[in-house]
Swiss-Prot record:
PANTHER family, per the entry: NADH DEHYDROGENASE [UBIQUINONE] IRON-SULFUR PROTEIN 2, MITOCHONDRIAL, NADH-UBIQUINONE OXIDOREDUCTASE 49 KDA SUBUNIT
InterPro entries in the cross-refs: NADH_Q_OxRdtase_suD, NADH_UbQ_OxRdtase_49kDa_CS, NDH1_su_D/H, NiFe-Hase_large
Gene3D superfamilies associated with the record: Cytochrome-c3 Hydrogenase, chain B (1.10.645.10)
Protein name: NADH-quinone oxidoreductase subunit D
Encoding gene (name): nuoD
Membrane topology reported for the UniProt record: Peripheral membrane protein
GO molecular function: NAD binding; NADH:ubiquinone reductase (non-electrogenic) activity; quinone binding
Organism ancestry: Bacteria, Pseudomonadati, Pseudomonadota, Betaproteobacteria, Rhodocyclales
Domain of life assignment: Bacteria
Length: 417
């Protein structure tokens, strides 16, 4: 009699649904997954070790490159850790700017996550819509930092500079004619806050469009309802955070439970799922984008009425203004010392965590009083989610593995570090 054996296949790292460099070794019984073994490390760059050889501020750009879809949120956790070690008070305007850009980043992340998840399952229209909105928010990144992705905008003590009074303008080139440029620049005539206000007024309508495409779509529901079910007990035991935890019905959000910056002043709700499947996690992310839009609106209203400093007035931590530095020897010395030697952070250890779009992103920093971290440990939310891949995927069809990877919203910059 013939022996029936399971067979093993490699899913990725060249698979379009592997979201980067995931190598998944699947053991299959026919088309049913018996075991899923994630192999990570293909994007390991030694960020934690590199940080030990750089000054505290020089490591800020490394944070952008961890989860390279949620850039400013990574920076935020790192800056919070330094500020807690220093016992530094951040100006209130800088706190509002940080919260506003955290929520812009959350929208950016979820737009890409939902768009690519739908694309993986076979709904191509969605990703074309979401990239249209991402373009506007990337322009907001570019307006404050000059970069569309790796912004390096947050600093220990505040942010690099205040919000600009004018948006960057598109110009005619071989890809864009005069009419196209005129249309693109139409809502870019005012300040960044004007541009964002215009975006927030339009965005809920865009969310309705996405829901029209997916929420009641029969094929989308067949591919996501009842797939990748995680109970609340399992989610807690596996260390899930963010939409992966809230999709299972656990209302845990650091912005509400352990507020940082000015989140305690914000009016927003925490969307929570019921069934813990891929569909509920999708609904959570959709509603989170609407709530982020609410928070951005509140920040815009406050920032319009309250001008002020955007970085701490402590020249041992933040550089003096350029115009004062050029006329005062003492401030020139501060500037020189800060950019050559870097600031010295008092001895101690601290853990700072924020509600990152993917979950709890934490930075555990240890200082020995030098100008460089003694040790930096990064807690990436996607690491715990991917570790549960075997448990979640077992018993599903091979086609459902794609839906499960999409709902995890994994990015390997942060998982491999």
């Amino acid at each position: 009699m013939a022996e029936i054996r399971n067979y093993t296949i490699n899913f990725g790292p060249q698979h379009p649904s592997a979201h980067g460099v995931l190598r998944l070794v699947l053991e299959l019984d026919g088309e049913v997954v018996v075991r899923a073994d994630p192999h990570i490390g293909l994007l390991h760059r030694g960020t934690e070790k590199l940080a030990e050889t750089r000054t505290w501020v020089q490591s800020v750009p490394y944070m952008d490159r961890l989860d390279y879809v949620s850039m400013m949120c990574n920076e935020h956790a790192y800056c919070l850790a330094i500020e807690r070690l220093l016992g530094l008070e951040v100006p209130i305007r800088a706190q509002y700017i940080r919260v506003m850009f955290d929520e812009i980043t959350r929208i950016l992340n979820h737009l890409l996550g939902i768009g690519t998840h739908a694309l993986d399952i076979g709904a191509m229209t969605m990703v074309l819509y979401t990239f249209r909105e991402r373009e506007d928010l990337m322009d907001a990144y570019e307006a404050v930092s000059g970069a569309r992705m790796h912004a390096a905008y947050y600093r220990p003590g505040g942010v690099y500079r205040d919000l600009p009074d004018r948006m960057p303008q598109y110009v005619v080139n071989k890809f864009k004619n005069a009419n196209t440029v005129r249309e693109l620049n139409e809502n870019r005539q005012g300040s960044l806050l004007d541009f964002l206000e215009d975006f927030t007024e339009r965005f809920n309508g865009y969310c309705d469009d996405y829901e029209t495409l997916l929420t009641d779509n029969r094929i989308w529901k067949q591919r996501t309802v009842g797939i990748g079910v995680v109970t609340p007990e399992q989610a807690k035991a596996w260390g899930f955070t963010g939409p992966m935890l809230r999709g299972s019905g656990v209302a845990w959000d650091l912005r509400k439970k352990q507020p940082y910056e000015v989140y305690d002043r914000m009016d927003f709700d925490i969307p929570v799922g019921k069934n813990g499947d891929c569909y509920d996690r999708y609904l959570c992310r959709m509603e989170e984008m609407r709530q982020s839009n609410r928070i951005v609106k509140q920040c815009i209203d406050w920032l319009r009425k309250n001008p002020g400093p955007v970085i701490a007035d402590n020249y041992k931590v933040a550089p003096p203004p350029r115009e004062r530095m050029k006329g005062n020897m003492e401030e020139l010395i501060h500037h020189f010392k800060l950019f050559t030697e870097g600031m010295h952070v008092p001895s101690g250890e601290v853990y700072a965590a924020i509600e990152h779009p993917k979950g709890e992103f934490g930075v555990y920093a240890v200082s020995d009083g030098a100008n460089k971290p003694y040790r930096l440990k990064l807690r990436a939310p996607g690491f715990a989610h991917l570790a549960a891949m075997d448990e979640i995927a077992r018993g599903h069809m091979i086609a459902d593995v794609v839906a499960i990877i999409g709902t995890m919203d994994v990015v390997f910059g942060e998982i491999d570090r």
